[in-house]
Amino acid sequence: SKKSKESREEKQERGEQLMRKMGIIEIADNDINEVSGGQLQRACICRSMMNRPKLLFADEPTGALNRTSSNEVMDELVKLNNEGTTIVMVTHDAKVAAKCGRVLFIVDGNIKGEYTGLKEITDEKERERSLNNWLLDLGW
């Protein structure tokens, strides 16, 4: 069966819901030069979520952001993941990786290790410490 066509109004409403969820509805009409890096990243996440994907690829989603904006973007990605969207993310930032439920350490395209022990740890600092210890054990 064919997917039902969504009306322009339905798409508009979903876009506004996503912007509210990401905390950027107030910048919806702003020029791109008038928004912060964190707001722009959240706008990109909104755009990628418009078609309700089951899987989202995020390549360094916090790479060019300050720590505050990075935390905001990661908080939104964690929420999306908790709502059922699988997220495959590339990052070189251990603080960012510590927010993930499963971490693969990849060198030259080869998986050198997999860590899933973060799921049970609720304290953010303890998650970071646990991941850093695992990375040290791998020689990183």
Model-derived segments and their meaning:
Residues 71-83:
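Helical segment within the ABC ATPase nucleotide-binding domain
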Residues 56-59:
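Catalytic Walker B motif of ABC-type/P-loop ATPase nucleotide-binding domains
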Residues 48-49:
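ABC ATPase C-loop
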Residues 52:
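Conserved catalytic motifs of ABC-family nucleotide-binding domains
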Residues 45:
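Hydrophobic anchor residue at the start of the ABC signature
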Residues 9-27:
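Conserved ABC ATPase "signature" region
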Residues 31-35, 39:
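Conserved ABC ATPase signature
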Residues 110-136:
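Conserved beta-strand-loop-alpha-helix hinge in the C-terminal portion
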